[in-house]
């Protein structure tokens, strides 16, 4: 009986030693991602959302990924400056690109620091801002991207920038 307990302890130790590095490698691999593969802003539009439930877009073809675009209430130039500042103020968000018509931001999750891409494109002629928020890795985001877009919508409405 003592031999079995000793073998059990050895097996548990082996499992702990092997699973730890494996999990670390998995997390690091999951965090590495090429945003260029997932982000396509500019007048050509956005990449469509994948079939996985971790992306929302105002230009999504699949209704389950759709969100309404933002409709500006005021002058596009002035409003766009406020939009840029508001996006930059979101928690754990880093502006990667902010120009006259495009914003690309990287949003990190609180615990595992996974990166999501938040992309906005302004069409000044009609005052429409198309928006896309997508996880770089994983299958489901548990609604994080949709909540991010709706939180941004709420902040911009509070500032009387969008309808």
List the predicted regions and their residue ranges:
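Sec-dependent bacterial lipoprotein signal peptides
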Residues: 7-29
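Ser/Thr-rich, low-complexity intrinsically disordered terminal regions
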Residues: 31-163
